[in-house]
A protein has these predicted regions:
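C-terminal accessory extensions appended to soluble enzyme cores
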Residues: 80-84, 90-154
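Conserved AdoMet/S-adenosylmethionine-binding subsite of the radical SAM
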Residues: 1-109
Length: 154
């Protein structure tokens, strides 16, 4: 049986944007407990946010993940970048002041705002490269077109 765990994002993203949620350490500890009880886990890193020092932040996240968990019990790793509807953006901005929406974005075929494809490809490629330092894993991209998968997961 597989249990999924969402790490959401790097510590810097959780601290800045994900109020009242568990820290990355708590999330990894929960995943470790599942593994200790015999479960394989699926890991999801979503949303990946284009923050300053993004490469280091997500590299640190992958290092924490891979050195804290039994990598032989990680079934797959899913990656997804920030995407949202215009309605969600309006709701968030009503509730709090945030710089989350300051990046240049494009409206996708699904009507959701997301980073330009070149930015998404670069973000995913950097993270995949960090993951592959620890071995071969089944990696997938959530909510992405085939051509993005082909560029990133060569």
């Amino acid at each position: 049986e597989i249990k999924g765990i969402s790490l959401d994002s790097a510590s810097e993203v959780i601290d800045k944007y994900e109020f009242k949620t568990a820290s990355i350490i708590k999330r990894i500890e929960a995943a470790k407990k599942l593994q200790d009880h015999g479960y394989d886990i699926g890991v999801r890193i979503d949303p990946i946010i284009n923050i300053q020092d993004r490469k280091k932040a997500y590299s640190d996240l992958i290092e924490k993940l891979m050195t804290s968990l039994d990598i032989n019990k990680i079934r797959d790793i899913g990656l997804g970048s920030l995407r949202y509807t215009k309605g969600l953006k309006g709701k968030v901005l009503k509730e709090r002041k945030t710089d989350l929406f300051y990046n240049e974005l494009v409206t996708g075929i699904d009507g959701k705002e997301r980073y330009f494809k070149g930015i998404r490809i670069k973000m995913y490629s950097e993270i995949v490269e960090d993951i592959q330092k620890y071995g071969e894993f089944e990696i997938y991209l959530g909510m992405e077109e085939d051509y993005i998968w082909k560029k990133v997961l060569k």
